[in-house]
C-alpha cells in the first residue's frame, strides 16, 4: 500500500518498508535539470477557464482546444515562449495515480497546473541503448495550482497524477502538430518508441498500452 503525506511544498510517496519516491516542489532547485518555472506570466485567465472543463474518472488528452487557443496566454506562448513558432494549446484532465509510461518530445512542453498535481519525471540520458529505463530513477514534483512550467525536451514525462487521490487538470502547450497520428516507417531503432508525431513513448507492461514499447523496468510507481 502506498500513501502520500503533504508537508508544505514537499510530499513523500511511501510504502510500508521504504520510501519509493521523494516529491520535491517545482519551486525547488532539484527541478532545474528537468525544466523551469515560468514566473512572469499571468495564468489566472486560463486556470479559471479550465474550471468549466470536465475531470473524468480516466484520463483524457486533447492536443488543441479552440477556447484555450483564444486566450492571451496562447499568444504569449507563440510569440515569446516558443519564439514565434506556432503552438497548440490543449489539456490533460482526469484521475491518475500511476506512472504507466514515460515519453519525450524533440521540443519543450509547457504545463499549466489548473489544479494541484504531481509530475513523475526522468532524464533521457538515463535511457539505455536498448531503450529500457529503470523506474527507480524517477523523481516526483508537486506543481501548485496556477503554476506554469517548461518541461525540457530532455525530460521524460507522462500524464500528471492527482494529489491524495484527487483528480487533476493541466493545460498542455506543444509545437503545433505534436501528438497526432503518424505513419511509422521504422527508419531507426528509436522508431519503435514513436507513438504519435513528435512523441516517443516507453511504457510499463502493467499499463497494457496497445502497441507501445514496454521498456520501463522496475515498479510501476503508484502515488
Segments from the language model and where they lie:
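Extracellular-facing segments of soluble proteins and assemblies that are Gly/Ser/Thr-biased and enriched
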Residues: 67-134
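Short, surface-exposed beta-edge/turn micro-motifs
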Residues: 106-109, 116-117, 138, 146-147, ...
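Accessory, usually C-terminal, subdomains that scaffold auxiliary metal cofactors
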Residues: 162-223
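Short, conserved secondary-structure segments in the cores of folded domains
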Residues: 2, 137-139
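A short secondary-structure junction signal
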Residues: 122-124, 130-133, 153-155, 159-164, ...
Amino acid at each position: 500500500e502506498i500513501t502520500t503525506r503533504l508537508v508544505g511544498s514537499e510530499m513523500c510517496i511511501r510504502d510500508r518498508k521504504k520510501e519509493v519516491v521523494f516529491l520535491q516542489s517545482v519551486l525547488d532547485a532539484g527541478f532545474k535539470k528537468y525544466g523551469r518555472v515560468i514566473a512572469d506570466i499571468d495564468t489566472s485567465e486560463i486556470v479559471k477557464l479550465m474550471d468549466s472543463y470536465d475531470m473524468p474518472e480516466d484520463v483524457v488528452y486533447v492536443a488543441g482546444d479552440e477556447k484555450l487557443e483564444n486566450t492571451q496566454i496562447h499568444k504569449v506562448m507563440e510569440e515569446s515562449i516558443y519564439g514565434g513558432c506556432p503552438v497548440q494549446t490543449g489539456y490533460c484532465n482526469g484521475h491518475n495515480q500511476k506512472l504507466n509510461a514515460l515519453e519525450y518530445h524533440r521540443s519543450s512542453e509547457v504545463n499549466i497546473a489548473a489544479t494541484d498535481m504531481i509530475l513523475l519525471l526522468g532524464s533521457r540520458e538515463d535511457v539505455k541503448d536498448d531503450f529500457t529505463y529503470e523506474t527507480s530513477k524517477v523523481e516526483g514534483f508537486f506543481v501548485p495550482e496556477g503554476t506554469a512550467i517548461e518541461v525540457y525536451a530532455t525530460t521524460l514525462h507522462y500524464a500528471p497524477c492527482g494529489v491524495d487521490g484527487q483528480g487533476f487538470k493541466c493545460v498542455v502547450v506543444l509545437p503545433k502538430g505534436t501528438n497526432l497520428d503518424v505513419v511509422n516507417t521504422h527508419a531507426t531503432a528509436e522508431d519503435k518508441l514513436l507513438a504519435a508525431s513528435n512523441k516517443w513513448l516507453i511504457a510499463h507492461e502493467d499499463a497494457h498500452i496497445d502497441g507501445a514499447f514496454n521498456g520501463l523496468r522496475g515498479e510501476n510507481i503508484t502515488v
